[in-house]
UniProtKB/Swiss-Prot annotation:
Listed HAMAP family: Ribosomal_bL21 (MF_01363)
Function statement: This protein binds to 23S rRNA in the presence of protein L20.
Lineage of producing organism: Bacteria, Bacillati, Actinomycetota, Actinomycetes, Mycobacteriales
Record's protein name: Large ribosomal subunit protein bL21
Family: Belongs to the bacterial ribosomal protein bL21 family.
Amino acid sequence: MATYAIVKTGGKQYKVAVGDVVKVEKLESEPGAKVSLPVALVVDGAAVTSDADALAKVAVTGEVLEHVKGPKIRIHKFKNKTGYHKRQGHRQQLTVLKVTGIK
């Protein structure tokens, strides 16, 4: 089994391994910058580590590749019989990360 980790960022959790490219909520880092992500769980073969003291020694590092926008979602509000309707769109800001190491 390969080594992988569960990292927390932007209020979500992602399963990552070395070499993975993932889209996460926007980070305030420039493209090319190195970032470290907080770890929730590490699986190394058959050994599963979830103890907070052991995870404090583990670091998942990555490199910011670019900042992109997610797909457009459309919001539509409507109230019956009053003629009220409102349309709105939203595109979430995302950061593309390449995981460079789990140590």
